Curated annotation (Swiss-Prot):
Its cofactor is Mg(2+). It comes from Castanea sativa (Sweet chestnut). The gene is rbcL. The active site is at residues 175, 294. The modification N6,N6,N6-trimethyllysine is found at residue 14. Residues 1-2 form a propeptide. The record marks 334 as: Transition state stabilizer. The lineage of its organism: Eukaryota, Viridiplantae, Streptophyta, Embryophyta, Tracheophyta. GO terms for biological process: photorespiration; reductive pentose-phosphate cycle. Belongs to the RuBisCO large chain family. Type I subfamily. The modification N6-carboxylysine is found at residue 201. Its EC number is 4.1.1.39. Binds 1 Mg(2+) ion per subunit. The disulfide bond which can form in the large chain dimeric partners within the hexadecamer appears to be associated with oxidative stress and protein turnover. The keyword RNA-binding does not apply. This is Ribulose bisphosphate carboxylase large chain.
Amino acid sequence: MSPQTETKASVGFKAGVKDYKLTYYTPDYQTKDTDILAAFRVTPQPGVPPEEAGAAVAAESSTGTWRTVWTDGLTSLDRYKGRCYHIEPVAGEENQFIAYVAYPLDLFEEGSVTNMFTSIVGNVFGFKALRALRLEDLRIPTSYSKTFQGPPHGIQVERDKLNKYGRPLLGCTIKPKLGLSAKNYGRAVYECLRGGLDFTKDDENVNSQPFMRWRDRFLFCAEAIYKAQAETGEIKGHYLNATAGTCEEMIKRAVFARELGVPIVMHDYLTGGFTANTSLAHYCRDNGLLLHIHRAMHAVIDRQKNHGIHFRVLAKALRMSGGDHIHAGTVVGKLEGEREITLGFVDLLRDDYIEKDRSRGIYFTQDWVSLPGVLPVASGGIHVWHMPALTEIFGDDSVLQFGGGTLGHPWGNAPGAVANRVALEACVQARNEGRDLAREGNEIIREAAKWSPELAAACEVWKEIKFEFPAMDTL
């Protein structure tokens, strides 16, 4: 080796491992309006300082690797690196910290949720220096959100398409979720829609199985929709699940739904993937279809409070990728959902501008700059006695979805739908008259049951049903 080369190597490059915090922990950094900001809940391994753990997250989710490399000198590390700019302890938790990381916008491909997640969470969660890691929230800058189409249509366009205003929409998941023939499935759809529901729904794992192929299901459901519309004078829909093994097959199913003239299709966005979901959302906007999103598999990712990704992040990602509805918990039913946290991500789905509010788990102010909103769907173990609370909690811009709470009615599917519609109309009227749904809800339902035998029967069946378990995910 020549003396010149030896000198250059010794001065400009030093092989080996170095502390991440020397490069990636920058507490004096002033965040930019164009930065993507992330809040991570970090649990370091014993002996790892929180500053080093936060810096490691910033490094491994941006430009860093485990050692200094020659090619570091061929780019501007200062321009492209992620920066851990603030760390704070988590109240009431030992050895847990919130690490705030800023990412330069140039690290991300425009209009790609897939690339965003691959960068931010794709590799760092297996890092040895961390015992556990959870992505609690993201701030999406307006300069990045404007590169996304977002929901195919949004809340106002959906209401205009359906000609339904001033109340939540009502839905029902057809049960049993698996095993029905296409004709019997279509019959259940018709009975529920005829009874007063706005939508019925394929369950998330109804795709194209031997007992009911997708094309047969689509045909019988379309027949049910048109028959119910003719008899009620209302626009009806059924969430036809287009999720498939390939993107090409998924689009083929959406095309067939459009040819049938139905208003809405459905996708399982986490199991199907963000690339497939964005492709379907673009097709739906171009062809006038609404898009219902199911969050199957979400609890695998978001349920543990110290590891994974919080659902508010998955909800933001869905609004960017595209969907007109998404399941969002209930607060009162059988599935997970703590009230303030749930209302926090419901606002992130629906509103244009959401202020930072740590009491609801919102770590950053989020400006969606008129990206269309998403209707939250409440489903899972809910029935007529829950109607006042659901109406108060979720408001008009929501879908309230009763599966067993419709089909479990002792008189059949149509009376179950009637009971839910009567309960909803009674709650909306009482609210509009200034009554307190939280305090007077049960009395409102009892009053309506006096003139609706279907509701009276439903009230009797579900008066003792409760799901009394504490929420796992609390602040």
